[in-house]
From Swiss-Prot:
Annotated binding of Mg(2+) 2, by residue: E303, N305
HAMAP family from the UniProt entry: Dala_Dala_lig (MF_00047)
Protein's UniProt name: D-alanine--D-alanine ligase
Gene: ddl
Family: Belongs to the D-alanine--D-alanine ligase family.
Length: 343
């Protein structure tokens, strides 16, 4: 039996294009390691920032551009791919759009399907699902861009509401961007109005969350119908918050795996992660972010990432390495889970 042909789909049109390329390079290396070299043949498919798909010999940003005629065509090699491994982050990647395309192709693929991916990308929908099953989370206010731009008086009323319900500091986020893109911390009315304008330029939907003094913890989930949770890790940093630069610049943030927290807190986080994974109808993989408030003992779920990063700085593969699963074995498991899910 020949090697399984894995379509490694990376790049994309979002602001997280470069992160996707770095993740794909790490995944390609894992597929070449050990037994995986005999199991799999990686077919790199690069999505340019204008949407063109290109077959490349290796993972990276190729020189030049694809021909104009390729805008609405897939490379011929696409027809030979047995299973897809999409690692396209952000909008048009992990929001259900790529997943819907792969469903139309009738090919198995790594990760969650259309619905779970879309819910996981939209922070407002995500928090609605978490709330529906009773998961504890920080207070938040959901807004539409039209709420801000339709009437100056209404704008002021919205700011009054945010100050009353959430107070300061608070965090303003575009609902559908990942990797902390477009997030602002507001400590007063002036910063709040600026933050709302920034978020509204990037997304039609905006979420404002109450600030909380807490430790930031993460847990990785792997599986389909019977998922498993990893050890819990902690992120610490010296910046105001865990923004894009902090997240992807070496040395800006420190990962502590496993986190030094009470065993009961670790078990609670692992249990909540599995509950959330199953409530979303997720498949394959996801990473869940939490706040732990030592002064009260509270554990609050913050977000899910249904297609987490796989760079050298990324928490997801490191959490599984600390749980006894190497990077090469992790990508092998993910492909097998994809084949199982789509059988």
């Amino acid at each position: 039996m020949g090697r399984l042909r894995v379509g490694l789909l990376f790049g994309g049109r979002s602001r997280e294009h470069e992160v996707s390329v770095v993740s794909a390079a790490a995944i390609a290396q894992a597929f070449a390691a050990g037994d995986n070299g005999d199991r799999y043949e990686v077919i790199p498919i690069y999505i340019e920032k204008d949407g063109r798909w290109r077959h490349t010999e290796r993972v990276g940003i190729p020189e030049g551009t694809a021909p104009e005629s390729s805008l609405w065509q897939f490379p011929a090699v696409v027809d030979t791919i047995d299973v897809w491994f999409p690692i396209v982050h952000g909008p048009n990647g992990e929001d259900g759009t790529i997943q819907g395309l792969l469903e139309l192709m009738q090919r198995p693929y790594v990760g969650s399907g259309v619905a779970a991916s879309a819910i996981g990308m939209d922070k407002i929908l995500m928090k609605t699902v978490f709330g529906a099953i009773g998961l504890p989370q920080v207070p938040y206010v959901a807004l539409q861009r039209s709420d801000l731009w339709s009437d100056p008086c209404r704008y002021n009323h919205l700011c009054d509401r945010i100050e009353t319900e959430l107070g300061y500091p608070c965090f303003v986020k575009p609902a559908n961007l990942g990797s902390s893109v477009g997030i602002s911390k507001a400590k007063n009315r002036q910063q709040l109005t600026t933050a709302l304008e920034v978020a509204a330029e990037l997304d039609r939907r905006i979420i404002v969350e109450a600030g909380v003094v807490a430790r930031e913890l993460e847990c990785a989930v792997l599986g389909n119908d019977k998922p498993q949770a990893s050890v819990v890790g902690e992120i610490t940093y010296s910046s105001e918050f865990y923004d894009y630069e902090t997240k992807y610049t070496d040395g800006r943030a420190q990962l502590h795996i496993p986190a030094e927290i009470p065993p009961a807190v670790s078990e609670q986080i692992r249990s909540l992660s599995l509950q959330a994974f199953q409530a979303l109808g997720a498949a394959g993989l996801a990473r869940f972010d939490f706040f732990y408030v030592p002064s009260t003992g509270e554990v609050l779920i913050n977000e899910v990432n249904t297609l987490p990063g796989f760079t050298a700085l990324s928490m997801y593969p490191q959490l599984w390495a600390a749980s006894g699963l190497s990077f090469p074995e992790l990508v092998h498991r993910l492909v097998q889970l994809a084949l199982e899910w789509h059988a």
